[in-house]
Structure formats: structure tokens, C-alpha cells
Amino acid sequence: MAIRKYKPTTPGRRGASVSDFAEITRSTPEKSLVRPLHGHGGRNAHGRITTRHKGGGHKRAYRVIDFGRNDKDGVNAKVAHIEYDPNRTARIALLHYLDGEKRYIIAPNGLSQGDVVESGANADIKPGNNLPLRNIPAGTLVHAVELRPGGGAKLARSAGSSIQLLGKEASYASLRMPSGEIRRVDVRCRATVGEVGNAEQANINWGKAGRMRWKGKRPSVRGVVMNPVDHPHGGGEGKTSGGRHPVSPWGKPEGRTRNPNKASNKLIVRRRRTGKKHGR
């Protein structure tokens, strides 16, 4: 993937850039793996906003991704196409298995049309192959990692992300997360070799607010410019600094997002660096 920069023909085009989509080999998805996707605008079943800054955006169809890959062990698959997915930053690869089934997976860096991938404990260590962590050598970069055996991939699924397998001890493997956190995971959990492709996604300059609206992202307004009825930081005569430590619109202190009493915290060897108090 490469980034194509626009010429400054309009204010919205000045500095803006876009992916060249050179790796895409097909523009229409596999019909049997597409499901309807209804936008909810960040509302719950009662119509109340539960996630702010969402709404609008282009209509999308959901591509069913195989995050498990645990029921095709020993069955080789050929990469038929590399496709665009509007629901994620990574590209997706359409696999044609030898038994005739078709499935999508997240496309790792270096995977191209015509390559052959496989899954299972005896698979080779090459990008796109899926194995249990106990069968992957230390130091290998992996993505699409499970947190629980058989639970499906949960970690390192976005464009350019990867996790390094540091080592294995007894029934746990130590992983260095993209955030720098070191975490232990059951060695029976599966992971896909390689890092996620489309790493240049992070370098795209969107150029104008309208492109964010096309993606379904609404404006994020600072609490300090609101009225007191709308936010704890609102109000005041003229410009003010808020007058208190940063809080959410509901008065909760900003930052501390992790549950200190979570049972899985004991599996975290070293926390990510946040600039805030750890363990909160």
C-alpha cells in the first residue's frame, strides 16, 4: 500500500491524502459472506445515545470474518482475492479451501493473491498461517490473537498492528502488546503469523470534516465550550479553563478506564505506559 496525496485544488484537498488501493484485487465482496448492517447512530434499544460522536456515514455491508480458524486444521486454502472492508482499517483476504468452502480472514502484511495458507499445530511459520501459541517460536510477530482458547481472535486486528511472542513458560505465553503492555495468555490460544497489513493507514490525512462524516463520525465538542447544563466544565464568563480536573460529561474523572478488581489483571506482567496512575 502507498499513500496518494491530493493537489491543493480546494481547501478540503490541501494536505489531504488517500490510499492508492494497489493491493486490492476485487471491488465486490463474496455474496455468500455478506450480511446486512444497520446503523444505530450510537443509540441503544430505547433510542438513547450510549456512544457519542456516531451517526450518519455511508451505507455498509458486513463481511463475515473467520476469527477462529480452528475447524479447518490441515486443510490448505488459496488466497483468491485481497479486498477492501469498510468496517475495519485492515484489508481482508478471501480464502478458497480445498474442500470448496470460502472464508474471509484479516490480510497480513506480505500476503498476496495466489498464496497458500493453512492452520493447525503443524503449519509452517509464515504470514497468514494460524497456529496455537505453543507451536510458535519466541520472538515471532503475530496478530489476531485469542484471549481464551477457542474464543476467536480478539487482539491485534487493526491495520499495521502486531504482537511479539516473548516466550513460553508452563501453560502460559508472554506477549508484548502494541501498547507496550506485557501480558500472559494460555498457550492453547491461537494466533496468526505476521503483522496486519495496510500499515500506511495511520499516515492518511483526512483533509476535511466531511470525510469523517462519510465514515459515520460526528464532531467531538469540548466540554469547556458548552453550557453548565451540558457539561461539568461548561459555563463561566468569557473563556475559562474549566476550573477543575478533567471529567466526563457525567462527572467521572477522566482517564481511569480499567477495572482494578478484574480477575484477569493477574495475567498482566507489565502495564502499558499511560502517563497516569497504573492499576486504576
Swiss-Prot record:
PROSITE patterns: RIBOSOMAL_L2 (PS00467). One of its GO terms (molecular function) is transferase activity. Residues 37-58, 268-280 have a biased composition (Basic residues). One of its GO terms (cellular component) is large ribosomal subunit. Keywords: Ribonucleoprotein, Ribosomal protein, RNA-binding, rRNA-binding. One of its GO terms (biological process) is cytoplasmic translation. Residues 27-58, 226-280 are annotated as: Disordered. Belongs to the universal ribosomal protein uL2 family. PANTHER family: LARGE RIBOSOMAL SUBUNIT PROTEIN UL2M, RIBOSOMAL PROTEIN L2. This is Large ribosomal subunit protein uL2. It comes from Mycobacterium ulcerans (strain Agy99). The lineage of its organism: Bacteria, Bacillati, Actinomycetota, Actinomycetes, Mycobacteriales.
